[in-house]
Swiss-Prot record:
Protein name: Extracellular globin-E7
InterPro entries: Globin (IPR000971), Globin-like_sf (IPR009050), Globin/Proto (IPR012292), Mb-like_M (IPR044399)
Top-rank taxon: Eukaryota
Binding positions for heme b per the UniProt entry: 96
Assembly information from the UniProt record: Artemia hemoglobin is a dimer of two similar sized subunits. Each subunit represents a globin chain which exists in two forms (alpha and beta), thus making possible three different phenotypes (HB1, alpha(2), HB2, alpha/beta, HB3, beta(2)). The globin chain is a polymer of eight heme-binding covalently linked domains.
Keywords (A to Z) from UniProt: Heme, Iron, Metal-binding, Oxygen transport, Transport
One matching Pfam family: Globin
GO MF term list: heme binding; metal ion binding; oxygen binding; oxygen carrier activity
Organism: Artemia sp.
Family per record: Belongs to the globin family.
């Protein structure tokens, strides 16, 4: 189980990543997903068509879907340590599995993807003095955070 500080650290890093921009974060997440699991592209055919053909009617749908994905990750991350949100998390899981659009293996892949993006974000921010200083103010030495990250 994660300690309270570890949970808060994950939430703080996610908040910093989101501040950079949702579209950047979404592109990172889906880019990594498709690089690691090209077989999942079939689930997103219409959205990928929108990206490559810039079909005007599909682009808003893609953007809306990507925002829903980020919102789902928000729910999971900010539910850490909050018993009151357990029901919402359960409903989110039931929604996906009930529609047969996500199986348990894919769900685990999604969480691993989220962890990888958070880790990459932390590495990126360590290289930017302003962010690194801010992280150190919150967590102490940033290098120790990365080495001892609860999500490694």
């Amino acid at each position: 189980a994660l300690t309270a500080l570890e949970k808060q650290s994950i939430q703080d890093i996610w908040t910093i990543l989101k501040a950079v921009g949702l579209e950047f974060l979404q592109v990172k997440m889906f880019g990594k997903l498709f690089a690691d699991h090209p077989e999942y592209k079939a689930h997103f055919d219409n959205f990928l068509t929108a990206i490559f053909s810039v079909a005007e009617d599909l682009v808003p749908k893609l953007r809306a879907h990507l925002h829903r994905v980020i919102d789902a990750f928000d729910l999971v991350i900010f539910a850490l340590g909050r018993e009151s949100l357990r029901g919402s998390l359960k409903d989110l899981g039931i929604f996906h599995t009930g529609r047969d659009i996500v199986d348990p293996v894919e769900s685990l892949t999604g969480f691993k993807l989220m962890v990888a993006v958070i880790e990459e974000g932390l590495d990126t921010f360590r290289a930017v003095p302003e962010y690194s200083k801010g992280l150190e103010g919150r967590f102490g030495n940033v290098d120790n955070i990365n080495e001892n990250a609860p999500f490694r």
